[in-house]
């Protein structure tokens, strides 16, 4: 009988078979863990897209983003309107200041125009007063009848001048003042710079001369 030189391979025992077989349960558990880790990694790639905002915090979808942009545009427009409002206030302030200046100027000009009108009216009456004044100085036979009437007219004219704001100046006995008086003659006298005779009464309105008085002035010899 032929004998195998290598001998018959002895069958492995059950324990050896058991030890040499792969650990199926361990491998399966490892594979399951790997698959789970791989799933988590793939899920991590979608974190940004699938991230859930905390409860109560609105999602920033397209509609919300558009509303935010619209709100920002409105805020920018508010800033522009505030700047425009400030500019309009400045312009209004300048206009108010200009108007106040214009009103003051027109008030002054109106007052000056009124004074000039009064002066012209008074100047028109002055020759009448002068004629009356000269008539009163004439010596006539019926002076007793003429004088009272002429004096009444003269006083009436002076009253009218007073209502117009005119003040007579240059009467006899007043101190001579070159601002209001014009000396047409100088004569010797007991006092210097005294008006001894009035040829033509002068008139002034406040600080403004309407007509200088034409007078004769005394001077000590």
UniProtKB/Swiss-Prot annotation:
Region (Disordered): 1-43
Protein's name in the database: Protein GrpE
Gene3D superfamilies per the UniProt record, alphabetical: 3.90.20.20, Head domain of nucleotide exchange factor GrpE
Quaternary structure annotation from Swiss-Prot or TrEMBL: Homodimer.
Gene Ontology molecular function terms on file: adenyl-nucleotide exchange factor activity; protein homodimerization activity; protein-folding chaperone binding; unfolded protein binding
Disulfide bonds: none
Domain of life, per lineage: Bacteria
Gene: grpE
PROSITE patterns in the cross-refs: GRPE (PS01071)
